[in-house]
Design a protein with these regions (language model features):
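Extended, highly charged segments
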Residues: 1-520, 524-586
């Protein structure tokens, strides 16, 4: 559900427990997020405020944020005005998605300091605003002006004005009749406009969720939809409206609220609980966990799509290059014909008029003197036509060797690009994507496409540390144990290189699917040890699992001692050659 007024009020109710805490740290991880370090009651807490249009919220957080090395201007201003202040009060008004944090410092009784931090959680209009005791804005994360089609001025020295609302306040309703009287006019209007029968209204032809959401302040569409589902309401009646009213009241007045995750944790709903929560910040941390997973998933998806777009554009370029090379090779297949034309023209010069001839038919003495028609350019003399055919022949003959080399190189390049796509398909975390981005950034194949920005400044700002044999910081292959034997699996091309060429011992056994993109797999062994056949087969199955053909059957897997695996100088990441191998089919 949306972070609506009901969630805002419920979160703020828990945050009453941070009254008396002092602000001792202020960070701004990104342009939409501020975190406040709080100290009090012998504990440290971190309050997260996010004004991203899709994920705006306020809650305590247990997830560390990566902060820029240089604090942004707004962060510096908040540090100046907030650090050392104590939280005097935290509250909301009605069901508005606005949280007010009153701050004070009474260390100097003659000069008390009072400030207010206002968090407006209103989608794309969200903001973080700092005011003084007279409601004069000191600064805000986003500035707006009535000159820019805004209904309020939000900038330094302007007076803070509470946003207007044309909706009813649910909290000011005293009875169900007040609730129904607010909805009834819209109900009648909707029935008249759509020529509906009041006796035959149901959820399918009447948008009750939208009507309630549009009538009452702070109640989101998804919140009402969940209530309709929980109460199993299909028909529109006054009794059902009363059930909805009572359910909203129950949630708002509940002392213990929890969240219910649905659809593989893609959404959540509030529900009342009879069990007292172990933590006084239960709702805060559960909603924080939900949004952390949601943002991480979105970040992963966006970052992956950016890299995939870059790789596919490069793949398309090299596939086009291969197509052009094949066209050139097809042209080279005709080069002997051009030589034949030149020879036959030369030997028949006495039979060809000097000019104005489009073609000539002569006997082909290479083919039992069978007749052959040779095209001519009528602008030129016959001898010059022959020279042109010899020139074409020599040009294609010289090109043939070069084009064959280019074709081999291009096929290897395409093979490497496809191996990177395989890596991307198997990436599980932002760190995995960061390693792939680092790999392609260092490769000349992608140089003209590398204008894409890393979606994850949080991930990409983290420079990959060099892989070392003793310091396994970046080098973190997948690890398995089969019948007591350790098996290591590379996660990307660079890690495959390091695993096989530097980390593995010469007596270890190397596995890789034959002619199929996949991970390098190393079976750790002792010198002169004979590995049982069933272990070799299980490791081969593991190698097949970590491959592009993992869903196929009868997959060929080559294996040999690491000492027989070599990496050619200048070859692409992940590319090796090997010998003395055996093959298992799994």
């Amino acid at each position: 559900m949306a972070f609506d007024g009901i969630v805002t009020k419920s979160i703020t109710k828990e945050l009453k427990n941070i009254i008396g805490y002092k602000i001792d740290k202020v960070y701004e991880p990104d342009k939409n997020t501020v975190t406040l370090g709080l100290y009090g009651k012998s504990s440290n807490l971190m309050l997260l405020i996010c004004i991203s249009s899709n994920n705006c919220r306020i809650s305590l957080t247990s997830h560390p944020q990566k902060n820029p090395s240089t604090a942004p201007n707004f962060c510096m201003l908040l540090r100046k005005y907030l650090i050392g202040l104590k939280i005097k009060n935290i509250y909301t008004i009605d069901l508005e998605r606005i949280v007010f944090i009153d701050l004070e410092n009474n260390e100097n009784p003659n000069k008390p300091i009072c400030r207010k931090l206002i968090i407006e959680l209103m989608g794309k209009h969200s903001n973080i605003i700092l005011t003084d005791s007279n409601n004069i804005i000191i600064d805000s994360m986003r500035h707006t002006s009535t000159l820019e089609n805004s209904n309020r001025d939000i900038y330094p020295t302007a007076r803070y004005i509470f946003p207007e609302s044309t909706k009813y306040s649910f909290l000011e309703l005293n009875t169900f009749d007040d609730f129904y009287n607010a909805i009834e006019p819209k109900l009648i209007e909707y029935i008249a406009e759509n020529s509906l029968n009041i006796e035959n209204l149901n959820v399918s032809n009447f948008m009750i969720d939208k009507m309630i959401s549009n009538t009452f302040n702070g109640i989101s569409l998804s919140f009402v939809q969940n209530i309709l589902s929980k109460l199993n309401i299909n028909e529109i009646s006054k009794n059902n409206f009363e059930l909805i009213y009572n359910k909203i009241n129950e949630i708002l007045s509940s002392s213990f609220l929890d969240i219910f995750l649905v659809e593989n944790q893609k959404d959540y709903y509030l529900y009342t609980s009879n069990i007292e929560n172990e933590s006084q910040f239960n709702l805060n941390y559960k909603i924080d966990d939900f949004y952390f997973e949601k943002e991480t998933s979105e970040l992963f998806k966006n970052y992956r799509n950016s890299i995939l777009h870059l790789i596919l554009a490069t793949l398309k370029k090299y596939e086009k290059r291969l197509e052009n090379i094949d066209n050139k090779l097809s042209e080279c297949n005709n080069m002997d014909t051009f030589r034949l034309y030149g020879e036959l023209i030369t030997s028949n010069l006495y039979r060809i008029p000097n000019r104005n001839v489009n073609s000539i038919e002569v006997e082909n003495y290479y083919d039992n003197n069978s007749p052959i028609t040779i095209p001519l350019d009528r602008k030129y003399l016959p001898l010059y036509n022959a020279k042109r055919y010899f020139k074409k022949y020599n040009k294609l003959k010289n090109a043939l060797a070069i084009v064959n080399v280019q074709k081999d190189e291009t096929i290897r390049d395409i093979d490497y690009i496809e191996s990177v796509i395989y890596e991307l398909d198997n990436a599980k975390s932002i760190d995995d994507l960061g390693a792939i981005y680092d790999e392609i950034s260092e490769n000349g194949l992608f140089s003209d496409k590398l204008k894409v920005k890393s979606s994850s400044k949080k991930a990409s700002n983290k420079k990959a540390k060099p892989m070392t044999k003793n310091k396994l910081t970046s080098f973190n292959p997948l690890k398995y144990v089969i019948d007591g034997y350790t098996v290591l699996v590379g996660r990307n091309n660079k890690e495959n290189d390091y695993l096989t060429c530097k980390f593995a011992n010469k007596n270890d056994i190397w596995f890789h699917t034959k002619d199929i993109h996949g991970s390098h797999v190393i079976l750790k062994t002792n010198p002169n040890e004979i590995v049982p056949d069933d272990v070799l087969f299980e490791v081969a199955k593991l190698a097949a699992k970590h491959t592009k053909a993992k869903n196929s059957s009868h997959i060929p897997v080559d294996f040999c001692k690491v000492s027989f695996v070599k990496k050619p100088s200048g070859s692409k990441p992940g590319y090796v050659i090997y010998s003395n191998n055996k093959t298992l089919y799994v």
